Amino acid sequence: MIAAIVDVGSNTIRLTVYQYEGQDTQVLFHRKTMAGLVHYIDKKRMSDAGIRVVCQTLNDYMSMLKQLPVTPDSIHVFATAAIRNIANTRQVVDAIRESAGIEVEVISGDEEARLSYVGAMHSVELEEGVLVDIGGGSSEIAVFQNKEICYSDSLPIGCLNAYEKCVEKIIPSEKERQAIAELVQKQLQAMSIPELGPLPICGVGGTIRASFKLKGVLGETDQANQMSIEELQGMIRRFKNHKKKHIAPILVKTPDRIHTLIPGMILLNEIARFFQSEVVHISRFGVREGFLYDRLAKGSEEK
C-alpha cells in the first residue's frame, strides 16, 4: 500500500510518500520546504501572507503527487504548533481546504508527543527514557517507562520561535543564550513532570538529527546514533560568533538551519539538564512515521 503524509510544522512543511505493508515501510519520495511559518505569526494570528505560503506549498505538493501512484484517499495532512497555537486556526484550515482541496488534521501537543514516540520506538530500543522532539514552534516531551508513556506535554517553544524571541543577529550571544536557557527552564519547572531520576533521551526531529550530523562534521566519533550531552555542550561552546570560519561546519552540513540550530541545541541541553540525561539516542523516525504506524499500518494489519 502507498500513503502520502504531509507534516505542516512551524519551520518546515514536509511531504513523505511511503510504501508499507504492516510494519514494513519504505520511503518512495520526500520533499521539504523551509516555510518558516513562525515568521508570519503576530499576536497569535497567522497573517494572510503566511496563509498564502501554506496554501501554495500544499498546492505544489498536490501537483507532485499527481505524478506519483498516490490516490486522493491515501493523502493525509496534519499540522502541529504553527496552526495549533494560533487564534485563527479555523481560518487557516478553511483556506487550505478551499485552495488545495484537502482537509488538515490539527493534532494536539499530547497527540504529537504520542505519535513521535510511536515512530521513534521503531528506530530506538529503550525501555525507559524521555522522548524529545524539538520543532520550530514547540517541543514535545514524553516520559516513558516499560515502553509505556507515563507523562507527555508540549513546551510552547521550539528552535525557530526561540530564535525569534531571543536572538537579534544569526548566532546567539552569551546573553541571548542565557535568555533561551532561562525561558526553557521556566517552562519545564511549570510542568507536573514525575521525578524519575536520570533518564536517557530519545531524540526525534530535524533539529536533533542536524545536531548529530554536525557532530560528525566536527570529527567526533560516531557512536551508533548516540550523542553525549558533553558532546552537545562542546558544540554549543564552539559556535559563539558570526565569523565564517567558526560557523562553516553549519553552513556545510545544515545551511538552512544556520539561525535555528544553536537555539535548538540550547533547548536540548536544558531539557537534558532537567532530566539529568547523559546521552541522546538519535531516532531516524518521528511523528510522520508514528502517524503512519498508528493510523494506517496498524489498520492494514487488522484487515
Residue positions per predicted region:
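N-terminal basic/disordered segments at the start of proteins
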Residues: M1-Q26
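Short glycine-aspartate micro-motif
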Residues: A3-D7, G129-D133, I201
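Ser/Thr-glycine-rich phosphate-binding loops at phosphate-binding pockets of nucleotides
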Residues: S10-T12, A120, G135-I141, G206
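Broad gene-expression machinery/nucleic-acid interaction feature
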Residues: T12, H30, G129, G136-S138, ...
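Helical "lid/coupling" subdomains associated with nucleotide-phosphate turnover
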Residues: V17, Y40-Q67, P72, T80-V92, ...
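N-terminal glycine-rich anion-binding loops that anchor highly charged ligand groups
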Residues: D24-K32, P69
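Dinucleotide-binding Rossmann-like beta1-alpha1 core, especially the glycine-rich loop
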Residues: V77
